[in-house]
């Protein structure tokens, strides 16, 4: 339940608008509300981090509005809470009116939801399930440079799950569409909320089965097999992609060293 922030309120401050995050001095604000001119703002507590409250304030600031990607090097728990705040702020902003009857909506006091004041329809934040998979062939891992990542970073393959599709089917389809190969021995590893914009990454490892690499140029700039001890530039630590790569490297080391 939201409330008006007072002078002595303190904690972590997620100030967000239109999927942007307020980052004074490039950092997520922490401390007393008065230090950040937040007294009098309406805020919603969205969690706790190390015993301190994490507050969401839906507001556009004139300066220092950036991407949640800029705080990806925070502790994972705090980064995920910042991502939750950005996603909730966008959810509340985009659900002011009911999509069925057009009447004004209001936030639920008991859950992350918006309620219609007229037809009683209930809306929840949209979450887009995605798969991400590390594919191993002997002592090598398949890594690709995506068209949206023109910074030299190579990563594993990923994509959105389609309507009526299982996670396993999504892995097989995405891998075939993007790289032209087939995989086998699919194993679930972990999951990670990913606020770009509202994804839930489900991570897998798999073994190469058959086929030659034929990339989809709309998705990839290039893809290739890289030996575990001679890898290109990788995603930053803390991402599920980096974990999958490191787990695959560990398997290769155990077998080939």
From Swiss-Prot:
It catalyses: a 5'-end NAD(+)-phospho-ribonucleoside in mRNA + H2O = a 5'-end phospho-adenosine-phospho-ribonucleoside in mRNA + beta-nicotinamide D-ribonucleotide + 2 H(+); NAD(+) + H2O = beta-nicotinamide D-ribonucleotide + AMP + 2 H(+); NADH + H2O = reduced beta-nicotinamide D-ribonucleotide + AMP + 2 H(+). Substrate binds at residues 25, 69, 111, 124, 192-199, 241. It holds the Pfam family NUDIX. Zn(2+) binds at residues 98, 101, 116, 119. InterPro entries: NAD-cap_RNA_hydrolase_NudC, NudC-like_C, NUDIX_hydrolase-like_dom_sf, NUDIX_hydrolase_CS, NUDIX_hydrolase_dom, RNA_Hydrolase_NudC, Znr_NADH_PPase. A motif (Nudix box) lies at residues 159-180. A divalent metal cation 3 binds at residues 174, 178, 219. It comes from the Bacteria. Divalent metal cations. Mg(2+) or Mn(2+). One of its GO terms (molecular function) is zinc ion binding. A divalent metal cation 2 binds at residue 174. One of its GO terms (cellular component) is cytosol. Residues 125-248 form the Nudix hydrolase domain. The keyword Hydrolase applies. Homodimer. mRNA decapping enzyme that specifically removes the nicotinamide adenine dinucleotide (NAD) cap from a subset of mRNAs by hydrolyzing the diphosphate linkage to produce nicotinamide mononucleotide (NMN) and 5' monophosphate mRNA. The NAD-cap is present at the 5'-end of some mRNAs and stabilizes RNA against 5'-processing. Has preference for mRNAs with a 5'-end purine. Catalyzes the hydrolysis of a broad range of dinucleotide pyrophosphates. This is NAD-capped RNA hydrolase NudC. It comes from Shigella dysenteriae serotype 1 (strain Sd197).
